[in-house]
């Protein structure tokens, strides 16, 4: 009789059962044995002999558990760490070199690279608290660590010293979760001191995003002037207006005026003072005690005030914006009837987001951004039930994905143009039925109020509007009789309009924007054809020159600037409502078609602001 190859008897292996049904197809006589304690497998080899494999899955855990028991009972230990930290009592910890070396590259180098500690039974350790070392030794044996939240910084510092990366990451993740306006600067400084790059970056990003709240905390007032200058020089500070940065600096100086008044000039040069409004500067020059006592700083701000009010070209500083995506928003539009869509295009990945609809469908509206909020102004609701011109002003908050109504304009305005100066929205021209407006009104968001300002010299609907050097430009349009190539400029200090050089081409419904201190007018309708030509106005030479034409003819298009390039969206080519989006690169003077809208449309309101909160979008799209 052939002997049974399987073991028998009362031993542990008698608990194995052959599981032939689990053998993979083509495995021949392979047999899998399984138990609750281990996994074993027999497989054929290339030479016809079978191979037996066995794995005890929790062996490592069990082995380290036994080694930890040996450590606690001080058996088979081959090193004693004698830990001394400042005035704390010294402590001794017995351990196994191999376990310490497996957990920490520092211990590994200490015990294997021929250093003097390699042959020592007692090793002196300084610079780390005994309680911290105790927790790190426990982690080496148990892969588990526990501490009070007040001890996290100390443990993380020790883990960095001994290069125990897993503990460093765990502590870093915990501290990121604890970031708060009151502790973010302290955590950032700590991370920089110990060289934890990721935690330092996350803490700095938190400071930039919550700048307003951080500047009210004690840690902010303990910054050095160099640290403060570095902070306020960031492009990605999340502030609604530059006055927040100005006030933060003045308050920092007032905290210790005697010692800090010497730094005011350096701070003001880091503040983007040309982004402050003349009214704000005038008030500070009159009332700020810090400026009153420093003639150099006062003269510096007086010069900026004069440059702003005289509308002199200045060096263009990047707009401050948090490091979140900035998207191109399109509101409303027309395709067979007015639309209520709000969508956002991300040029970085080519995706579109569908967001909260306008409360009332509108086309011929205009879009703009103030303080990160998107405003939809005027337009008309063309519907099967009739056409209604709109005086509405609605505000969209990307953080809540919600619209809220604001005070309406004094009159409805369809095919309107808008621009923003000093945080105020200017609504220009447009029509109400057969009335073509030359009137202009200004909206103050802080007061939720509209006020009429000086009317344009010419009635204009389908007017393109842009702002450059705090001057409001109205370009082209239709006066009720003729399409226009004329353009005019509004001076807010004088409350008056002046004509400027006319365009080379008649354009109604053109897209108008500002890029690199020039005004661009793209497309439009000349009374006979939709246009693809584009021209640029140089305010220094007061001349219009043609640049490369768009690939498609289009009027009633949307236009905006994103990261130094012009984007035109949709419009009407005389036959079709376009869904194409083109991008202009001023460096190469070329247009390229970059994407398509989700559907063709004309008369959209377009503007650029921060990416919406995905959490709010997901919650509002949830149908559960």
Curated annotation (Swiss-Prot):
Q: Which residue positions hold the site described Sensor for electrophilic agents?
A: 151, 257, 273, 288, 434
List residues, modification S-cGMP-cysteine. 434
Modified positions (S-nitrosocysteine) in chain numbering: 151
Q: Tell whether Nucleus is among the UniProt keywords.
A: yes
Enumerate the Gene Ontology biological process terms: cellular response to oxidative stress; protein ubiquitination; regulation of autophagy; ubiquitin-dependent protein catabolic process
The record's subcellular location field reads: Cytoplasm; Nucleus
Q: Where does this chain mainly localize? A: cytoplasm
Q: Which SUPFAM superfamilies match?
A: Kelch motif, POZ domain
Q: In which pathway does it act?
A: Protein modification; protein ubiquitination
Cite the post-translational modification comment: Non-enzymatic covalent modifications of reactive cysteines by electrophile metabolites inactivate the BCR(KEAP1) complex. Accumulation of fumarate promotes the formation of cysteine S-succination (S-(2-succinyl)cysteine), leading to inactivate the BCR(KEAP1) complex and promote NFE2L2/NRF2 nuclear accumulation and activation. Nitric oxide-dependent 8-Nitro-cGMP formation promotes cysteine guanylation (S-cGMP-cysteine), leading to NFE2L2/NRF2 nuclear accumulation and activation. Degraded via a proteasomal-independent process during selective autophagy: interaction with phosphorylated SQSTM1/p62 sequesters KEAP1 in inclusion bodies, leading to its degradation.
BTB domain: residues covered: 77-149
**InterPro entries listed in its UniProt record:** BACK, BTB-kelch_protein, BTB/POZ_dom, KEAP1_BACK, KEAP1_BTB_POZ_dom, Kelch-typ_b-propeller, Kelch_1, SKP1/BTB/POZ_sf
Key words, A-Z: Cytoplasm, Kelch repeat, Nucleus, Repeat, S-nitrosylation, Thioether bond, Ubl conjugation, Ubl conjugation pathway
The residues joined by the cross-link N5-[4-(S-L-cysteinyl)-5-methyl-1H-imidazol-2-yl]-L-ornithine (Cys-Arg) (interchain with R-135 in KEAP1) are: 151
Instruction: Kindly indicate whether the keyword Cytoplasm belongs to this entry.
Output: yes
The UniProt note on how this protein's activity is regulated states: Ubiquitin ligase activity of the BCR(KEAP1) complex is inhibited by oxidative stress and electrophile metabolites such as sulforaphane. Electrophile metabolites react with reactive cysteine residues in KEAP1 and trigger non-enzymatic covalent modifications of these cysteine residues, leading to inactivate the ubiquitin ligase activity of the BCR(KEAP1) complex. Selective autophagy also inactivates the BCR(KEAP1) complex via interaction between KEAP1 and SQSTM1/p62, which sequesters the complex in inclusion bodies and promotes its degradation.
The terms describing its cellular component in GO are:
Cul3-RING ubiquitin ligase complex; cytoplasm; inclusion body; nucleus
Which cysteines share a disulfide bond?
Answer: none
Report the residues modified as S-(2-succinyl)cysteine. Answer: 38, 151, 241, 288, 319, 613
Kelch repeat start and end residues: 327-372, 373-423, 424-470, 471-517, 518-564, 565-611
The record describes its quaternary structure and partners as: Component of the BCR(KEAP1) E3 ubiquitin ligase complex, at least composed of 2 molecules of CUL3, 2 molecules of KEAP1, and RBX1. Interacts with NFE2L2/NRF2; the interaction is direct. Forms a ternary complex with NFE2L2/NRF2 and PGAM5. Interacts with (phosphorylated) SQSTM1/p62; the interaction is direct and inactivates the BCR(KEAP1) complex by sequestering it in inclusion bodies, promoting its degradation. Interacts with NFE2L1. Interacts with BPTF and PTMA. Interacts with MAP1LC3B. Interacts indirectly with ENC1. Interacts with SESN1 and SESN2. Interacts with HSP90AA1 and HSP90AB1.
The record's comment about this protein's domains reads:
The Kelch repeats mediate interaction with NFE2L2/NRF2, BPTF and PGAM5.
User: What's this protein's function?
Assistant: Substrate-specific adapter of a BCR (BTB-CUL3-RBX1) E3 ubiquitin ligase complex that regulates the response to oxidative stress by targeting NFE2L2/NRF2 for ubiquitination. KEAP1 acts as a key sensor of oxidative and electrophilic stress: in normal conditions, the BCR(KEAP1) complex mediates ubiquitination and degradation of NFE2L2/NRF2, a transcription factor regulating expression of many cytoprotective genes.
Q: What is this protein called?
A: Kelch-like ECH-associated protein 1
Instruction: Provide the species name.
Output: Pongo abelii (Sumatran orangutan)
Gene designation per UniProt: KEAP1
């Amino acid at each position: 009789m052939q002997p049974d190859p399987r073991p028998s008897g009362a031993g542990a292996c008698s608990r194995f059962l052959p599981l032939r049904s689990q053998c993979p197809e083509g495995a021949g006589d392979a047999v899998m044995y399984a138990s609750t304690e281990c996994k074993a497998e027999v497989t054929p080899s290339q030479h016809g002999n079978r191979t037996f494999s066995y794995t005890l899955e929790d062996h490592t855990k069990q082995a380290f558990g036994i080694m930890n028991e040996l450590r606690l009972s001080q058996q088979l230990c081959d090193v004693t760490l004698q830990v001394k930290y400042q005035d704390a009592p010294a402590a001794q910890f017995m351990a196994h070199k191999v376990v310490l070396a497996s957990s920490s590259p520092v211990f590994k180098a200490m015990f294997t690279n021929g250093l003097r500690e390699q042959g020592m039974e007692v090793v002196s350790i300084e610079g780390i608290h005994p309680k911290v070392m105790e927790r790190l030794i426990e982690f080496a044996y148990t892969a588990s660590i526990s501490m009070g939240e007040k001890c996290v910084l100390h443990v993380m510092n020790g883990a960095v010293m001994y290069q125990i990366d897993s503990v460093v990451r765990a502590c870093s993740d915990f501290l990121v979760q604890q970031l708060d306006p009151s502790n973010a600067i302290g955590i950032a400084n700590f991370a920089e001191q110990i060289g934890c790059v990721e935690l330092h970056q996350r803490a700095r990003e938190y400071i930039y995003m919550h700048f307003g709240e951080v500047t009210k905390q004690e840690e902010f007032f303990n910054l050095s002037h160099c640290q403060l200058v570095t902070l306020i020089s960031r492009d990605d500070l999340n502030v609604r207006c530059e006055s927040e940065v100005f006030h933060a600096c003045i308050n920092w100086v007032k905290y210790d005026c005697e010692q800090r008044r010497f730094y005011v000039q350096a701070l003001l040069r880091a503040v983007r003072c040309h982004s402050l409004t003349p009214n704000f500067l005038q008030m500070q020059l009159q009332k700020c005690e810090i400026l009153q006592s420093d003639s150099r700083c006062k003269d510096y701000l007086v010069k900026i005030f004069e440059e702003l009010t005289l509308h002199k070209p200045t060096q263009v500083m990047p707009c401050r914006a948090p490091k979140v995506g900035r998207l191109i928003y399109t509101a409303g539009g027309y395709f067979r009837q007015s639309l209520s869509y709000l969508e956002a295009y991300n040029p970085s990945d080519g995706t579109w987001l569908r967001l909260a609809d306008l409360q009332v469908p509108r086309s011929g509206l205009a879009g703009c951004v103030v303080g990160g909020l998107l405003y939809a102004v005027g337009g008309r609701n063309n519907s099967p039930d009739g056409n209604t011109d709109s005086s509405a002003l609605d505000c969209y908050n990307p953080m809540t994905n919600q619209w809220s109504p604001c005070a309406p304009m004094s009159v409805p305005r369809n095919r309107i143009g808008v621009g923003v100066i000093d945080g105020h929205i200017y609504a220009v021209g447009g029509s109400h039925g057969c009335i073509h407006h030359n009137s202009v009104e200004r909206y103050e968001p802080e007061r939720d109020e509209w006020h009429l300002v000086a009317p344009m010299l010419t009635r204009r609907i389908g007017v393109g509007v842009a702002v450059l050097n705090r001057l409001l430009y109205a370009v082209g349009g239709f006066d009720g009789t003729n399409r226009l190539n004329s353009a005019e400029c509004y001076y807010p200090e004088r409350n008056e309009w002046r004509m400027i050089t006319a365009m080379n081409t008649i354009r109604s419904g053109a897209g108008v924007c500002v890029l690199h201190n020039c005004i661009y007018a793209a497309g439009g309708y000349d009374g006979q054809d939709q246009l693809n030509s584009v021209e640029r106005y140089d305010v220094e030479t007061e001349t219009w020159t043609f640049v490369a034409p768009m690939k498609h003819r289009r009027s009633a298009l949307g236009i905006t600037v994103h990261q130094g390039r012009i984007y035109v969206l949709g419009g009407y080519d005389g036959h079709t409502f376009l869904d194409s989006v083109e991008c202009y690169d001023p460096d190469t003077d070329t247009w390229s078609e970059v994407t398509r809208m989700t559907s063709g449309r004309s008369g959209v309101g377009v503007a650029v602001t921060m990416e919406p909160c995905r959490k709010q979008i997901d919650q509002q799209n949830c149908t559960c």
